[in-house]
Regions:
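Short alpha-helical "recognition helix" segments of helix-turn-helix
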Residues: 51-53, 438
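Conserved hydrophobic/aromatic packing and binding residues within compact polymer-binding modules
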Residues: 63
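Short, amphipathic alpha-helical "recognition" segments used to contact nucleic acids or chromatin
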Residues: 31-47, 427
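DNA major-groove recognition helix of helix-turn-helix
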Residues: 67-68, 454
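FIC/Doc superfamily catalytic core
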Residues: 33, 60, 74-480
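Charged, alpha-helical scaffolding/interaction elements associated with membrane systems
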Residues: 44-45, 69, 296, 460
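Short, Lys/Arg-enriched anionic-surface-contact patches
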Residues: 10, 14-37
């Protein structure tokens, strides 16, 4: 078994504090500059991307981004450092960054003008006839590159190994659909647990409350969409998805045949109005525009799915269930477009954690002249982060399976308690834990017994032992 040699590396030492103060380098810029220098140093020393990510405690995505140093230009004078992926801020944020004495409206208009010069204008419009647009920022390009190339390759590599030897693809899909059904419903106010969601999906338990019905309905809608044989998403498919999502959850007075017949508003987590849905007389024409847009241009499908998501919520065609229907339909669209990697994880899981930001991005589009860049960057960021999470999960599972297969091949037997220790350490962020960590987490564990088990696992080469202060630190002795 091989192990990456642990080395101490101080990313900050390459930039002097005086330089930072003198040139007013922001904390964000400083952090990025430090990351670049650290990554380039490890690359030059022959480390791989995975090893560099582990040693610097960065995500693989971050390391990939800086590996060939294409996103950031390093100059001798730090004050000249410019990021090509400069944060795409709103006017609301810009007013805190503008130099004293400069006119906010005038300076912002210059920024807006430059953005519009390179923007992509869509055929989607608001009720006043103004087109929605976006800028394909370096952040968006980087996310698409990661999703389509790096993530796809790694997910396929790990998933093929896992499905071949340890779990079924059906089991993985059910697990992912259970998560998506649960989190998409909680965003809209359902109260339940992941355990209940998995019971509803995997054990086919009958839902007993409105919240459980929302989760179950969401699952049935996703399942229906994935089994649909048509190559494209259509209005009829979307209406069927809504029908399944809203079944037995709408109040009697809000039951509808197709689209809503009353005007509505969208509220954020604090109950504040962030958007007024389209007037009932305009819903049909705007939805027609949306489905026509999905198949009438060469915009990247990942960007297009984010636009579909936004515009659907923007129009708000139904009295309830708009968010769930938008997320389910955009998910199904991506799978139909050949992005099977989206079957591996739940996008809604992170949206649920970032719910305030989610609603804020919707509002930012309206407050900044229908610029959808804010929402697209947010959604693609969520997708990229979701991929990081599932890749980390697959990597840990892959290492776990590798360890246990090695033990079987070598005829080494270990106890169930020792297996639990291995699994516990594999789930720790840095693949390391002390005896104190383990016994605190597992209150019934006997300290002496755990000490004996960890030392045995060290003796047979599964773990390594080092010092962390006064305690022994046990780490997984395999990087595969």
């Amino acid at each position: 078994m091989t192990k990456v040699k642990k080395v101490k590396y101080n990313k900050r030492k390459h930039i002097k504090v005086g330089d930072i103060m003198q040139n007013k380098l922001t904390k964000r810029e400083q952090s990025k500059q430090n990351n670049i220098l650290a990554i380039q140093t490890f690359k030059n020393q022959g480390y791989t991307v995975a090893q560099t990510a582990e040693l610097l405690r960065l995500s693989k995505r971050t390391v990939y981004r800086y590996w060939d140093n294409t996103d950031y230009k390093i100059f001798n004078n730090i004050s000249e450092v410019k990021t090509e992926t400069e944060q795409y801020i709103t006017k609301e944020k810009y007013k805190y960054q503008i130099e004293k004495g400069k006119d906010l409206d005038y300076e912002w208009e210059k920024i807006l003008s430059k953005r519009k010069e390179i923007a992509t204008y869509t055929e989607l419009k608001n009720e006043k006839g103004n087109k929605l647009w976006f800028v394909e920022t370096e952040k968006i390009k980087s996310a698409i590159d990661y999703i389509e190339i790096k993530a796809k390759d790694d997910l396929l590599k790990y998933s093929k190994s896992l499905f071949k030897n340890y779990i079924s693809s059906e089991e993985m899909l059910l697990d992912s659909l259970a998560d998506e059904s649960f989190y998409s419903s909680t965003i809209e106010g359902a109260f339940s647990t992941r355990k209940v969601a998995k019971e509803l999906v995997m054990d086919k338990r009958v839902p007993s409350s409105k919240s459980e019905k929302m989760i179950y309905n969401n699952h049935m809608a996703l399942k229906y969409g994935l089994e649909d044989k048509e190559s494209q998403i259509t209005e009829d498919l979307m209406l069927k998805i809504f029908e399944l999502i809203s079944k037995d959850t709408l109040d009697e007075e809000t039951q509808i045949n197709k689209y809503r017949v009353e005007d509505v508003v969208v509220r954020d987590t604090r109950g504040e109005i962030i958007h007024e849905g389209a007037h009932v007389d305009n819903i049909q024409s705007m939805m027609d525009d949306l489905f026509r847009f999905m198949y009438s241009n060469d915009i990247n499908p990942i960007i297009k799915s984010a636009i579909f998501h936004f515009y659907f919520v923007f129009v708000h065609p139904f009295p309830d269930g708009n968010g769930r229907t938008a997320r389910a339909t955009s998910y199904i669209y991506l799978v139909k477009e050949g992005y099977d990697i989206f079957k591996h994880f739940s996008i809604s899981a992170l949206i649920a954690q970032k719910k305030s930001k989610y609603y804020k991005c919707i509002k930012d589009v309206e407050d900044n002249e229908l610029d959808m860049t804010y929402f697209i960057e947010f959604i693609l960021g969520v997708v990229s982060e979701s991929i990081d999470i599932i890749l980390d999960k697959y990597t840990r599972k892959h290492i776990e399976n590798y360890i246990f297969m090695e033990l079987v091949d070598k005829g080494v037997n270990i106890t169930n308690d020792q297996k639990k220790i291995i699994k516990y350490i594999l789930n720790k962020e840095n693949y390391s834990a002390t005896i104190e960590n383990y016994t605190k987490k597992n209150k019934s564990s006997d300290y002496k017994k755990v000490n004996k088990d960890m030392n045995y696992l060290t003796d047979i080469g599964i773990l390594t032992k080092s010092k962390e202060g006064r305690h022994n630190l046990y780490s997984i002795n395999v990087i595969k």
